[in-house]
Structure formats: C-alpha cells, structure tokens
Swiss-Prot record:
Role of this protein: This protein binds to the 23S rRNA, and is important in its secondary structure. It is located near the subunit interface in the base of the L7/L12 stalk, and near the tRNA binding site of the peptidyltransferase center.
Assigned protein family: Belongs to the universal ribosomal protein uL6 family.
Species whose genome carries this gene: Flavobacterium johnsoniae (strain ATCC 17061 / DSM 2064 / JCM 8514 / BCRC 14874 / CCUG 350202 / NBRC 14942 / NCIMB 11054 / UW101)
GO molecular function, one term: structural constituent of ribosome
PANTHER family, alphabetized: 60S/50S RIBOSOMAL PROTEIN L6/L9, LARGE RIBOSOMAL SUBUNIT PROTEIN UL6M
Pfam families xrefs: Ribosomal_L6 (PF00347)
Annotated GO CC locations: cytosolic large ribosomal subunit
Protein name per UniProt: Large ribosomal subunit protein uL6
Keyword terms, alphabetized: Ribonucleoprotein, Ribosomal protein, RNA-binding, rRNA-binding
Assembly with partners or alone: Part of the 50S ribosomal subunit.
One Gene Ontology biological process: cytoplasmic translation
Amino acid sequence: MSRIGKSPIVIPAGVTVEVKDGIITVKGKKGQLVQEFSDVNVTVEGDQVLVERSSDHKDHRAKHGLFRSLISNMVVGVSEGFTKELELVGVGYRASNQGQKLDLALGYSHNIVLEIAPEVSLETISEKGKNPIVKLTSFDKQLLGQVAAKIRGFRKPEPYKGKGVKFVGEVLRRKAGKSA
C-alpha cells in the first residue's frame, strides 16, 4: 500500500470538499479548484478526506499516491496558497509589471512581455544593488509551477557564471572555466 496514499488529508476550517461522479471540488477563502480522478475511491468523513484504490492493479497502485497528493495540494492551496520567487542574475537583467503583464529584460535584443494568468498574482521587487526578484502567488500549485517554469525557461541559469533566471534558494551546479 502507498505510504503517501493511505494517510488521510485533514480539512482545515473554512474549506469544503465535495466529491461527485469522479470529480472533486475544493472551495476555500482563496478560491475554488476542481480535479477529475479515476482508479481511486475518494470519501469525505467528517474533517478528513480518504483516498483508497479500487484494486491492486499496477495502474491503480501508481495513481493512489498521486491523487492523494493532488487533493492535498488543492486543500492547502485554497486555505493558505503557494508562493514561488524567481531571481534574475545578470548585468542589465530587469523585471517590471503592469497589472498582469510581466516585462523581462534578459539580455536579448528585445524585451519579453508575458501575460500572466489571472489566478496568479504577480509582484516584482527591484532593490538597488540586489538582483531583481519576481514573486508569484496562487492557490493553484500546478498553474503556479507552470508559469514559474515558463519564466525560468526564457533564460535558464548557465553553469559557468550562474547568469540567468533561477528560483530563490536553488543551488546551481557550477563548472570551472578553461584553465589558461
């Protein structure tokens, strides 16, 4: 049995969970999330959500822990929310935002303008002498990770000088340059 899958999910106060016809809906103060599920049985008992697999088939065992984690992330998201911070490391790298539009100067001949989904709140922090930081906040962990990965993908950190867009706290594997 999956160690992750068999542990129950505790529903905090202010969060409602509804299960109907293979669709789970989680509502909270931050928003509402809907997820389709298959091959597992989801039941709500009091202030707990239990995820059980329908059989011991290989596919069902694989999805047991997955759906438990997805539902757990939904519950945490609508109650507390998630945050990701990206740091722009490099000379002349800048970030600014106008509403939900993120404007990035990453050393290309043109600026990159990215329209951010309305579910993700955007904030840019630029302090003199420090690297600019893009702070993303959302109740949907999947969407947040997707947006953050897209921004990071515009200029991935390179291993020699460490220049590029990286997550705050991310440890980069550095390489030594050519020895003269």
